[in-house]
From Swiss-Prot:
Protein name per its UniProtKB record: Death domain-containing ATP nucleosidase
Region span, Disordered: 184-248
A GO term from the CC aspect: cytosol
Gene that encodes it: 109585858
This protein's UniProt keywords: Hydrolase
Biased composition regions of type Polar residues, renumbered to the chain: 218-227
InterPro entries: Nucleoside_phosphorylase_d (IPR000845), Nucleoside_phosphorylase_sf (IPR035994)
GO biological process, one term: L-methionine salvage from S-adenosylmethionine
Organism: Amphimedon queenslandica (Sponge)
EC number(s) recorded for this UniProt protein: 3.5.99.-
Transmembrane segment boundaries: none
Region (Purine nucleoside phosphorylase domain): 263-533
Class of this enzyme: hydrolase
Length: 533
């Protein structure tokens, strides 16, 4: 095993994980018999504790990859090469499997109302009104286990919820639990029984039966986006509905070797879907289905990039990501990764999907989808007193075929709620800034090297390109790669903030924007009229 390479990959992964994935990983270690990690917030340090306990680097990597992938964490193909293809959490570490399974079950309940109802039910019936809003989801599942609500091979306490929300869940878990093998490489629970941390004290305050926003949702001062629920968005009249989070069980991962994808599959791929950040990739992968004749989406690490091959609507596609870290955002990494993917596949069309910032405050609202008919490259600018000027004055046109497909009729602005051409994504507020309906606009975007969060600087961008509806960071590079390979490209992104100094306040709009853009592209690629493109 290349320990140095693994350490480097884990350091990089640790920088990218959010607090939820750290909480889940910590819960899995608790299930594996590792104690005393309650305050640790670094994935890398948690992994070190795991590796110290197992004394087996490959086992520790296998365990880690399993946990992160189960909850939709992406960009792990290279690390997965060091994992064992035979690793089975359920048979080796049944307690950890139980805790992760129940967390996944509750986490996947959408919308928020369903999840809140389920947690209120568990709290009221089994936990004497324990206030589940006072802890995170993984912490609540730990309380459930410590109080005997769930046990290895026995989740019957959740039977009514399972039948209501996911009928197959009970049978799936019971089948796995039959295979449990308590001869784990980890220290067994019996061996550490005397050192087991006591169950958290249940506070006196009671969970009410009221359905409310969960802990961690935006404050009342900022209008909240609707919870998209890991892709639980439907297109009216569409034959494809995305209801489940992207899950490692849907993916073929090359463990130590690359799976050979047939030439027929490679030649049949006409679309490259490019994303930048993890949330953008997640929005696309949640809607990616296995290719016809396959049970799983294909995940590969080739030419130095992570690739995902599957079906998006009616079309086989390859999905790429250019920014695994914040430092990789921007035009140059996007161009580099796009070129690498184009060396492997020969798609006719490139679609960049993700999040942008709104430029035109009169017309563009948070959550709206922007279809770029042109990309104005503001990477090459001249800075003058009080203003900036684009040195490349001609904006790059998006592909005619793609613009024709994705732009909407009737002034390029149409509501996307309700009728046959509208997808079911509704905003919660009725004020002007966050208009209730998601709208689709078609017009120019600017592509900048900066992550813009300053109203004054945005005003300068607006003066440089007064026709621009939105701005983003990767489009210019993707358009350059498309030119090099003589293919069409387009940027379709949804507004996640207004670049006016309030990015932190808007942060909960970013997941919604990722879902909106991904869903809009899916809506059109699922149209029978696109089959012969």
């Amino acid at each position: 095993m290349d320990a140095a390479a693994i350490i480097s990959l884990l350091n990089s992964t640790s920088d990218r994980v959010d607090q939820f994935h750290v909480e889940v990983y910590r819960l899995s270690l608790y299930g594996a018999g590792i104690r005393g990690m309650e305050e640790e917030t670094s994935l890398f340090n948690l992994f070190n504790s795991l590796n110290t306990s197992t004394g087996d680097l490959q086992l520790s990597v296998s365990f880690t990859v399993h946990v992160l992938k189960k909850f939709g964490f992406t960009g792990l193909a290279e690390l997965t090469r060091y994992a064992s293809p035979d690793f089975n959490m359920a048979s080796s570490y049944p307690k950890a499997d139980l805790l992760l399974t129940v967390t996944s079950f509750l986490y996947d309940l959408h919308p928020v109302r369903e999840r809140s109802n389920a947690l209120t039910f568990i709290s009221s019936v089994y936990l004497n009104g324990y206030n589940y809003r006072s802890v995170t989801m993984p912490q609540f599942v730990k309380v459930m286990f410590d109080k005997g609500v769930i046990m290895i091979g026995d989740v019957s306490a959740l039977d009514s919820l399972i039948k209501q929300y996911r009928p197959s869940f009970f049978n799936e878990y019971m089948e796995r639990s039959k295979l449990t093998n308590t001869n784990s490489t980890f220290v067994s629970d019996d061996a550490t029984q005397d050192n087991t941390a006591p169950a958290p004290t249940i506070p006196d305050d009671r969970a009410t039966g009221t359905v409310a926003a969960e802990k961690g949702q935006p404050s009342a001062q900022v209008n909240q986006p609707p919870t998209t629920g890991g892709g639980n968005c439907t297109v009216s009249g569409s034959t494809q509905t995305s209801t489940n989070s992207f899950n490692s069980t849907n993916t073929v991962t090359a463990a130590g070797k690359e799976e050979k994808v047939s030439d027929d599959v490679t030649k049949g791929i006409k679309f490259l879907l490019m994303t930048a950040t993890d949330p953008e990739l997640k929005g696309v992968l949640e809607r990616l289905k296995p290719l016809d004749g396959r049970d799983e989406v294909i995940e590969q690490f080739k030419n130095g990039v992570d690739l995902y091959i599957g079906k998006y609507g009616k079309h086989p596609v390859v999905v790429g990501q250019s920014a695994h870290t914040k430092g990789q955002q921007g035009s140059l990494p996007a161009e580099k990764v796009t070129n690498k993917i184009m060396e492997i596949f020969k798609p006719k069309y490139i679609i960049a999907i993700g999040v942008c910032f709104g430029m035109d405050g009169k017309e563009v609202n948070l959550g709206d989808v922007i279809v770029s008919d042109r990309i104005a490259d503001l990477y090459n600018i001249r800075v003058e007193p009080g203003c900036i000027k684009a040195r490349i004055t001609d904006a790059d046109k998006a592909g005619d075929t793609l613009v024709s497909l994705f732009r909407n009729p009737r002034n390029d602005i149409v509501s996307v709620i309700g009728k046959s051409r509208r997808f079911n994504m509704v905003k919660p507020s009725f004020d002007k800034e966050n208009a209730k309906e998601v709208k689709v606009h078609c017009g120019p975007m600017v592509s900048t090297p900066a992550l813009v969060d300053d109203a004054e600087f945005k005003e300068k961008l607006s003066k440089a390109r007064p026709d621009a509806l939105a701005g983003e960071m990767e489009g210019a590079g993707i358009f350059l790669a498309a030119k090099d390979h003589k293919v069409e490209a387009i940027v379709i992104k949804a507004v996640g903030d207004l670049a006016d100094g309030k990015k932190i306040e808007y942060k909960d709009w970013k997941p919604f924007a990722c879902q909106a853009a991904a869903e809009y592209v899916l809506h059109h690629l699922d149209d029978d009229r696109t089959i012969h493109m």
